[in-house]
Amino acid sequence: MSVTPTANSTEEAANITASPRLWPYTEPASAIIILVVSLIILLTIVGNVLVIVAVLTSRALRAPQNLFLVSLACADILVATLVIPFSLANEIMGYWYFGSTWCAFYLALDVLFCTSSIVHLCAISLDRYWSVTKAVRYNLKRTPRRIKCMIAVVWLISAVISFPPLIMTKHDEKECLINDETWYILSSCAVSFFAPGLIMITVYCKIYRVAKQRSSTVFVAKNGLERQPSQSETCFVRKDKFEKESPSSNSSESAQRQEELDDIDLEESAASDSRARGSRFSKRRRVEGERRGPQRSCRVSWAAHQEPGSRQQQLASKSKVAQMREKRFTFVLAVVMGVFVLCWFPFFFTYSLQAVCGERCGPPEALFKLFFWIGYCNSSVNPIIYTIFNRDFRKAFKKVVCWSAQRT
C-alpha cells in the first residue's frame, strides 16, 4: 500500500512551482535504490512466471487447488509491473509525476493486489481445512471449475474493498497519498489485513489441532495403549498381503505388527485422489498391545489382499503419493502465510498506530518507509519458499529452466 507520510508534504507540494525541486537522495544513493528495487522487480516477475508455468505443465502440481497459487502469482506479477515501478519513481523523485488520474488507479491497484494476496491465503487455508476435515465429501466437489469460482470471488471481494474509497477521493497533481482520515485508515487496515489474517491464523491452528489429534491416534495404534477413538479418528493402514501365522518368537510378531502400523496415514485415504476411491475394502481388526488383556478397538481400514503389480496396488500407491503431496503443500502454504504476515504486519501496525495517535507515537519516517518496502518484497519470496520447501516445485522449476535453455 502506497503511503509516504511526511510532516511537511503539503507545504512542499505548494512550493513545487515556486522553486526547483531537489531529489531527496544523492545520486549514488538513488542508483543503489534503483538497482535493488529493479532486482526485486525482476526476481518477482521471473519467479512467479516460473510458478505459473510449473503448475500448468507439471503433472505433480496439476491438482485443482494449485490454481490458487497461479492466481496469487498473477497478483504478485501485477504488483511488480503496475505498482512497484511507480512507487520507485515517487520515492526517488520525491513527488508524484504521473498526474491525479493515474494516481487514483495506482493507489486502487496497490490496495487491490495487497488485499487480494491475503484473501487468496484465506481461501487457501479454508480449502486445506475442508480437505482435512471433510475429505471425501469436499474432494468430490474440489473441481477446477469450483476453484476458479472461488478465485473469482476472491478478486471480487478485493475489488469491492479497494476501489470505491480510492477512486472517489480527489488527489493532488504533484502528490499521490492515500486517504489519511482516521476512519479510513483503521477500516482499510482491518478489512485488508487484520481480519483476513485472523481468519487465516485461526483456520491453520484448527488444521494443526486436527493433525495432532490424528497423530495421537497413530501413536495409540502403534503402542497398543487403551484409548477410545473419537468418531472422526480413523487409523488407515495399508498391508499388501496377509500372512498366515507361523511359529515364531514374540519379538518377530511384534516387529511384524510394528511394520504394519508404520504405514498409518494421518489423513483419510480419499483426501487427495478421488480416483483411488473404490480401490480399498475395509474390515475391522483389533489392535492389541503386547502383554495386555483385551483392548478397545480402533477402526482400521485394511487394503484387500493384492497381488504385486495389480491395479488396486497401483491405485493405492497413487493415493499414498497424493496424500504425501497434500501434506507437504499444507506445510509449504503455512510457511507462505507466516512470511506474508511477517512482511506486512510492521507496515499495517505502524500505519494504524499513526492514525490513532499521530506522529508522536509513530516510527521515524525512514523506518516506516522500510516497513513499506518490506511489504513489497513479499511478492518475490513465494517462489523461493516453494523452491526451498517443496520437492515437486524444485523438479518442475528445473524442468522448465532446462527446457527453456534447450530451446535457446
From Swiss-Prot:
Keywords, alphabetical: Cell membrane, Disulfide bond, G-protein coupled receptor, Glycoprotein, Membrane, Receptor, Transducer, Transmembrane, Transmembrane helix
Cytoplasmic side: 56-67, 127-147, 206-332, 391-408
Biased composition (Basic residues): 277-286
Disulphides: 103-176
Keyword Transmembrane included in the entry's annotation: yes
Site annotation Implicated in ligand binding: residues: 110
Family matches, as InterPro entries: ADR_fam (IPR002233), GPCR_Rhodpsn (IPR000276), GPCR_Rhodpsn_7TM (IPR017452)
Swiss-Prot/TrEMBL site (Implicated in catechol agonist binding and receptor activation) positions: 188, 192
Positions of glycan attachment: 8, 15
One matching Pfam family: 7tm_1
Biased composition (Acidic residues): 260-270
Assigned GO CC terms: plasma membrane
Residue ranges, Extracellular side: 1-30, 94-103, 171-181, 357-369
Main location, first listed in the record: membrane
Gene Ontology biological process: adenylate cyclase-inhibiting adrenergic receptor signaling pathway
PANTHER family from the UniProt entry: ADRENERGIC RECEPTOR-RELATED G-PROTEIN COUPLED RECEPTOR (PTHR24248), ALPHA-2DA ADRENERGIC RECEPTOR-RELATED (PTHR24248:SF0)
Role: Alpha-2 adrenergic receptors mediate the catecholamine-induced inhibition of adenylate cyclase through the action of G proteins. The order of potency for this receptor is dexmedetomidine > norepinephrine > epinephrine > oxymetazoline.
Family assignment from sequence similarity: Belongs to the G-protein coupled receptor 1 family. Adrenergic receptor subfamily. ADRA2D sub-subfamily.
Protein's UniProt name: Alpha-2Da adrenergic receptor
Gene label: adra2da
